[in-house]
Amino acid sequence: MIKLGFHVSIAGSLPLAVSRAQEAGCDTFQIFTRSPRVWAAKPIEPSIAEAFIDALNISGIGPVVDHMPYLPNPAAEKPEIYARSIFTMTEELDRCDQLKIPYLVTHLGHHGKEDGHKKGQEKVIAAIGQALDESEGETMILLENTANEKNTVGGTFTDIGVISDALSNERRVGFCFDTCHAAAAGYDLKGHGAETVFGWFNDEAGSLDRLKVIHLNDMKGGVGSHLDRHEHLGLGYLGEETIHDVLTFPKISHCAFIMETPSDEIRTDKDNLAVARRLAV
């Protein structure tokens, strides 16, 4: 049976995220280990890390996925932003190791006008390579596809393949596939189907064996819109048939399926989870 869950809040304390995941009925979940909107991160006290790990072990939920905060840009043109981005990625890998979190999802950033795309790729490769070399533990960095907005790195499967192929520490580099981002970038999951689109990903980005997380999101925009706006499952362009197609595609059944859908007056997280469970059979 596939594992389904959400991005959950750590408000109050890290161990409370486990309680929230349990309350929502999650099999797996994603967090930020810190505020995603600032550079500075308060160190995780050993007692807090121990409480988080204990709560997780008791819950039976897993794997847990961490997401990089918003400010780092591993393709940054400005040297000070680039250096801080590498430091933050290294720090976040160490925080994952402290919390026994196996996966850290990262976007690949935006390159500057002067640098151009190829230079942006080279910076991302160097940044991730340095972070892996300088961090402790075995946490994997998962490269996430984007909606291919202007100047982004990682907006095409080929782009992700260039990054992953250049990183020699392959055992600690994997993938996160976002369904909304893929379709917004022009990969029509609705029109071509999961088997075809994930086949392209396998051929151009890397083996599906290295795909560890699916961000299962419907979308407010259409194919090729480059609009990164998530919608409730089945209520956006992709629709229930496409979500079912993704959830039942055998070659990705080993992945953790994380929803980053809205929680509002239309649907709660529990409502979206019920839809996902219905569409997974």
UniProtKB/Swiss-Prot annotation:
Zn(2+) 3 binds at H181, D228, H230. Zn(2+) 1 binds at H67, H107, E144. SUPFAM superfamilies: Xylose isomerase-like (SSF51658). It catalyses: Endonucleolytic cleavage to 5'-phosphooligonucleotide end-products. One of its GO terms (molecular function) is zinc ion binding. Binds 3 Zn(2+) ions. Zn(2+) 2 binds at E144, D178, H215, E260. InterPro entries: AP_endonuc_2, AP_endonuc_F2_Zn_BS, Xyl_isomerase-like_sf, Xyl_isomerase-like_TIM-brl. Its cofactor is Zn(2+). Keywords: DNA damage, DNA repair, Endonuclease, Hydrolase, Metal-binding, Nuclease, Zinc. GO terms for biological process: base-excision repair. Its EC number is 3.1.21.2. It holds the Pfam family AP_endonuc_2. Endonuclease IV plays a role in DNA repair. It cleaves phosphodiester bonds at apurinic or apyrimidinic (AP) sites, generating a 3'-hydroxyl group and a 5'-terminal sugar phosphate. PANTHER family: APURINIC-APYRIMIDINIC ENDONUCLEASE, ENDONUCLEASE IV ENDODEOXYRIBONUCLEASE IV. Belongs to the AP endonuclease 2 family. This is Probable endonuclease 4. The lineage of its organism: Archaea, Methanobacteriati, Methanobacteriota, Stenosarchaea group, Methanomicrobia. The gene is nfo.
